[in-house]
Amino acid sequence: MPGAVDFKERISRQRPHDRETYGHAGNTDLQDIVYQLESDRGRIVNSAAVRRLQQKTQVFPLERNAAVRSRLTHSLEVQQTGRFIVRTLFRQLGPRAAEVGLDGLEGALESLVEMACLMHDVGNPPFGHFGEYAINDWFERNLDALFERRIPPGQGDGLLQQRMLTDLKHFEGNAQAIRLVVKLLRLNLTYTQTAGLLKYVRPAYEPKPDKAAANHYLNKKPGFYLSEEAFVDELRRVLGMRPGTRHPVAYIMEAADDISYCLADIEDSVEKGILDIRQLADLLVKKFAVHHSPDAPIPGDADNMSFQRMVDYSLEKAEREPINKVSEFFIRLRVKMIHPLVQHAAQQFIDNFEAVHAGTLGRALMEDGSLPHAIVQTFKDVAMEWVFCHPEVETLELQGYRIIQGLLDFYAPLLRLPAEEFQALAEGRQAAAPHPQLLVRRLPSQQIKAYLEAMKGVAEDPLQRQWEFYHRCRMLQDFVSGMTDQHAQDEYRALSAL
């Protein structure tokens, strides 16, 4: 075990808005750290962002069948898997935990991982990843002309303007989660808890690196926006993290998500009638054979079963079940699969402790070419080929695209107003034509207040006009991305007079 690694360096009780000041990475009072993390749990569990997940898409938008997963039920499953990984990690480490500074941290790490898992999807817009595409597509087509109308060519800072344009054209759910926690909900979580959400490490205005680049994995998506860059810089300072690195908690959260959703999406497809369990069993074995031998024993399985035998065993148990064959199939399959996958994730954390501690491991814990990796990839392959491209899913995604594009079209007049007029409206003063007044009144007060608060921060900035328009665009993205699927559909219908 690497003696130079000390996980306690990455844990601090410090918060952005603290009455007390702590030193670098803070504080070795473990009892107080656990107490502060309990406060984080309360803030997160009681937040509106978590409640909204119950009406946001996992795979099937606007789903009425409560047995099919929403983002909330998915996040609860990820939370449980994350907890299981942490407990398995400490069981596998045993007394060696002290060698890497993990002694006494089981409760703290468990809470950090659980809450990172629960929050990992809060930044996702309505209609899932297709919703992200719809927002970015609208801004790609409209933003340059809107920006030029407010900031004519030759005025302002050219480099800053280019960064702002690129930033706004790359909306991403992970980056939005950071913004939501820090600027919109103002949860004032410990820096350590928020760091667990930083799955990707580059600002949205920086280009995506080539796949061959050493830093590609951690930078393949935006991790935060220009508007939160100062916060992320301070987070890194407090936790002793170098730029371009991840917090160790993010690796466990990611592994828990990978393990949970790959099987859950398949189960939902059976619940929806897209596949039956016999079809699924055949597909799983065929797809697994592409990556690995289906007859090879799976490490960590108590019965030394192969993938083929696990699938057959689950099918046999389901056939004997007189009432709910589908449920029995997935219960058996999940129990047989989850244990070896969780053990593998925990062992990968241990085997790569130096890189995980430094935040430089350039892959997911489950992506190592191993047999457990083949299991996860098999489920993803089946979901990609048989679930995500199903006509029902694609039709709902197209409807979601039209809804989000339509909402942005409806509210675009607010981006065409002069800065003075929009600020007057945001402050509650009558300073524009009736149409934009009515639009502003439909915006949540929370998002208007976040805009006004951002404007206070640039009141004396010579580039205030650029920042004002940037924050106005952010506010519109906050508004649309914060909607549930149903709210977005209702708002679209209302403004379309349907």
UniProtKB/Swiss-Prot annotation:
Domain HD positions: 71-262
EC top class, as a word: hydrolase
GO BP term, pick one: dGTP catabolic process
Cofactor(s) this protein cannot do without: Mg(2+)
Organism domain of life: Bacteria
Gene3D superfamilies noted in UniProt: Hypothetical protein af1432, putative deoxyguanosinetriphosphate triphosphohydrolase like domain
Any GO molecular function: dGTPase activity
Catalytic activity: dGTP + H2O = 2'-deoxyguanosine + triphosphate + H(+)
Keywords from the named record: Hydrolase, Magnesium
EC number: 3.1.5.1
Family recorded in the similarity comment: Belongs to the dGTPase family. Type 1 subfamily.
Function (record text): dGTPase preferentially hydrolyzes dGTP over the other canonical NTPs.
Protein name: Probable deoxyguanosinetriphosphate triphosphohydrolase
Species name: Pseudomonas aeruginosa (strain ATCC 15692 / DSM 22644 / CIP 104116 / JCM 14847 / LMG 12228 / 1C / PRS 101 / PAO1)
